[in-house]
A protein has these predicted regions:
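Bacterial N-terminal signal peptides that target proteins for export
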Residues: 1-7
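Hydrophobic helical h-region of N-terminal Sec-dependent signal peptides
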Residues: 8-13
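C-terminal motif of bacterial Sec signal peptides marking the signal peptidase cleavage site
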Residues: 15-19
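Mature extracytoplasmic or organellar-lumen-exposed domains after removal of signal/transit peptides
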Residues: 22-349
């Protein structure tokens, strides 16, 4: 009956159940006791394990359904069937009537949407509440505050923008962050050769407006770097100067994407002569960014489910730690998919 994993698990379950319930009390009573001092019993242990398993099972089901919707079959609003990857790349149904409409979706519904959310909601909402005097409200407004993983989650959100813009997934970005992102002066130091695909938004924009491409790449990296500069954990440093700097940089990126990049792409590449180029970018985006991310999501959430089930059946410190580590691992593709919350993930809720 080791205290470490029992106390940690009881805290995790208390906060998770509080967040998922309709109870607005930020301090649920956990059955009449302080969360740290919950009584251990075989009944409690079984309930906690079952709760973890059901949450992991739902995550696994969602990840599987999402991946299958892109690669196997998806029913759109008009009742058309087919893999969503085909619908997007070939503009066979729904909102995509041209290659340009796909690129617009990538910019506004994808990249702008998450840049704006990180700056204007994920950082600004807690900051506004906290600095207005509602410190408890500010704390509870922090996404992922109970796992102390907010800062890395937000960084991965920005990396999802980078992957979309570059048309390729960076396979070592997280490891470079772990080595200290402040060590890199700019995206030029951070990027590896070949990170930017030939058929990408970056290459297309650079071919006609290299200064704009430079500004986009600079702000993407600056946003990630500013987020990583927030003292860890974010929940304990909501009102820091670094938090304000990160919020402002992300909003600057969002404004650039919506107010300059999207109009520029429409005006410059709206002629049908660019359709083949835009088609190639859409295909590269789906095949090299979306599908690998969702495949990774499916695989990692299956591993998480297996680990949680193993812990449920054989409670131990080692099995608990394995489940915790796999939960953190499974978070990465979730967060890195947020620059393409389009199609099935939006329509299926």
């Amino acid at each position: 009956k080791n205290y470490f994993y029992l106390a940690a698990l009881s805290l995790a379950m208390t906060f998770s159940m509080g967040a998922c319930s309709d109870n607005n009390d930020p301090n649920p009573d956990g059955g009449g006791k302080d969360p740290v001092n919950l009584d251990y019993s075989s009944e409690n242990a079984s309930a906690w394990g079952n709760y973890m398993y059901n949450v992991a099972m739902l995550l696994n089901d969602d990840a599987t359904m999402l991946y299958n919707s892109w690669v196997t079959d998806y029913v759109d609003e008009q009742g058309s069937h087919g893999p969503y990857a085909t619908i997007f790349k070939d503009q066979t149904a729904g909102a995509y009537q041209s290659p340009l409409s796909c690129i617009e979706e990538m910019i506004e519904s994808g990249m702008w949407n998450i840049a704006n959310e990180v700056g204007d909601a994920k950082i600004k909402d807690p900051y506004t509440k906290y600095t207005s005097g509602d410190k408890e409200g500010g704390l509870y407004a922090v996404e992922s505050w109970y796992s102390w993983h907010s800062r890395d989650d937000y960084t991965n959100n920005i990396f999802s923008i980078r992957n979309t813009y570059y048309g390729r997934i960076d396979d070592n970005d997280v490891s470079k962050v772990d080595g200290n992102l402040s060590a890199f002066n700019s995206y030029k130091d951070f990027d590896d050769e070949g990170d930017i695909a030939e058929h990408s938004l970056s290459k297309l924009i650079a071919s006609t407006n290299p200064a704009l491409d430079e500004e986009i790449k600079t702000l993407i990296f600056a946003s990630a770097k500013a987020i990583q500069a927030i003292p860890q954990p974010f929940r304990n440093n909501i009102d820091s100067e670094e938090s304000v700097a990160a919020m402002n940089t992300c909003m600057e990126l969002a404004n650039l994407l919506l107010n300059e990049v999207k109009p520029y792409v429409n005006q410059t590449f709206g002629d049908p002569e660019y359709d083949d180029d835009l088609d190639a970018i859409a295909e590269q985006f789906v095949d090299a960014v979306v599908l690998p991310t969702y495949k990774d999501l499916q695989e990692k959430n299956k591993l998480l489910l297996d680990a949680v089930n193993q812990f449920r059946q054989n409670p131990s410190n080692d099995n608990f730690e394995k489940a915790c580590n796999l939960w953190i691992t499974a978070r990465e593709p979730w967060e890195k998919s947020e620059a393409f919350l389009i199609g099935p993930v939006a329509n299926l809720g």
